[in-house]
From Swiss-Prot:
Coiled-coil annotated residue ranges, if any: none
TM stretches of this protein: 12-32, 42-62, 79-99, 534-554, 564-584, 600-620, 631-651, 662-682
GO biological process: one example: zinc ion transmembrane transport
Low complexity bias locations: 160-180, 302-325, 451-465, 476-489
Biased composition (Basic residues): 120-129
Keyword Transmembrane: yes
Annotated compartments: Membrane
Official protein name in the record: Protein zntD
Similarity field: Belongs to the ZIP transporter (TC 2.A.5) family.
Function statement: May transport divalent cations. May participate, with dstA, in the regulation of the differentiation of stalk cells during development.
Amino acid sequence: MGISLSVLDIKIISTTVLFILSLLAGIAPYWMRNLNNSSRYLSWSNTFAGGVFFGAGMLHLFATADEDLQPYVQKYNYPFAALCLCVGFLITLFLELIINSIFIKSNTFASLHGHSHSHVHLSHGHSHHGKDNGSNGNPGSGVGIGMGSVGALNSKKNKTTSPTITPTTPSEGTTTTTTTTTATTAATAKEIVLEDEDEDEEKDIMDEIIIPDDYDENDDEQIYKKKQSKCARTKFRKFIDTIPTFSSTSTSSTSSSTKISEKQRLLDSSNSYYYNQNKYKGIIGSHIDIDKSGSGVGGFSNNNNNNNNNNNNNNKNNNNNNNNNFRTEIIIQPISTTSNNSVHHYPSSSVNYHPFITTTTTTCSNDNSNSNNNNSSNNNSSSANITPNTNKILSSSKSLSYRYNGDDEEPDIIIDYDDIDYNQEGRTRGNSLGSDSNVHNERIVLINSGIGNSGNIGSNNNNNNNGGGGGGGGNSNIDYNDNEENNNNNNKIESEILIKDTTTDSIKNMKGGEHQHQHLHQQEIIVVTKKSNILLPFILVIALSIHSLFEGLAMGVQSSEIRVFDILIAIFAHKILASFALGISTITSSNEKPSFLKLFLLVFVFSLTSPIGSILGMVIVGSGVTGSMVPPILQGIASGTFLYVAVVEIIPKELSHDSNDILIKSFLLLLGFSGMAVVAIWV
């Protein structure tokens, strides 16, 4: 004897099963992230979800709203459904803009991108929305020069462990001398600590400033005093380094001078120094910018410049002969982070190589005379060669940006994971640090995007807490001279950057300045998008819940078993896919580690809407509410939200990522849309 179920029983059982399956589908992406290549699978799933949202919005929500509003369309001769779709699209857009205006203000961009490098003449950083050091920069200003500064640095040697380094500095006019230092597997613990300096020590800063070897105080006395004054007013931070045991292998030509320059002494961390970032021209960029105002983080200066300006090809050949110094990566992984006045510790297992230890010493000469010897080089800077880290790198042709605001209780981080994983090769930039910035995010890959040996380091020290922009990968044809009126062709330097392609494991030559304008605009968009995506899951829940509520309502008002089953099939097919898409969007919309509680609550609310709608439908049957304009209007608005999420948030982002998966993602996008097209047959 068969079991006889009433319409009410069918509704209760179906809504219960629908709730459970929808909840499971929504939280499934949380465990998907632990799979191998999880980011790739999540990206595929998100593309599929984009097709689902697009199909659901246009073929289901909009079609239903248009059908229900036809009597009013005919009566008033007006496309109400299309109006509702546009309203929903614009509401979602304006809601994101409002959130952006609250959380991403103009001074945030200025803090992230900082001032233009106004001392680097004819550079992209100077010409692209550049600002003077006294005012905030617009988005994009201060970015595009592959340089940075060590910041206010106090590097102290630990008494128990010290590096064994034999740096040499050739005299003026000699050939380049190379000193290579290789780090052994350090059994000794290594930590890097950033902490505030006592205020009563600031008065000693003036006595500790290092003056570069090639600095001519007589010619630039006023500039020097001005920079000293600014430096003295700046709140400095200490850089305290306990270095593991190193072994050194030196392969160098005979040098006519064994004198170690102040620059080299700073680089090999053999003594304690304060470093004024404005004094050295073209010294290495740093992976930690600890100056309060900060000049950003760039790459490593290493271009052996031949000043024979009559033959640029010879200059290129000289640069290519010294390209090994660009094939380096640094990986930093903090293990603890606190809030304001924080102290950050970095374990030796993650930071295997210190950026100020392994160096390539070049000629520290200010001789700008022409040279006919293409094998020799006259550099105005020391440069660094960091032994490549043996850990697997995330990328070597991409970079990321982050910001730390010391006034916040918790660090505010912007990490362009999209930019790291999916930027096309050759679009690299340095990392940008904001005011009071410390390296504190989970994992950082710094790319050597060197400026060569030209240009001052960053912008001047200033007290308006505007961080510098950081690098973007070299520059081409930059005229540099401390005295703007005396710029001449002897100072013109053409530098090249080597970008390592992790896919083909090949090295690409590229003019650093050539791609910067295009990338700056992309950077600006990325920052806005990543912030606004924080709101995306909540927008989706609202839109999905409205739709799901009326789906349940439609099922609740039915009195025929056949009609209940027809609607139930459509709801099952759509809601499970939509719930999975919601989970994917929640996981991929945030830069932070996904919270299971947040995901569960969002999916739970969405899963609960269909049963609630079904109960409401059964309660208000015959009340006349379901025949009003309210349900189709809300459905039309929800269709606009779905359209926005699909064509603005999901599809462009996913299809612009990894080009190797473009065919797979296109297929998944069409599959998601086709699935909703099939579901629409029963709706």
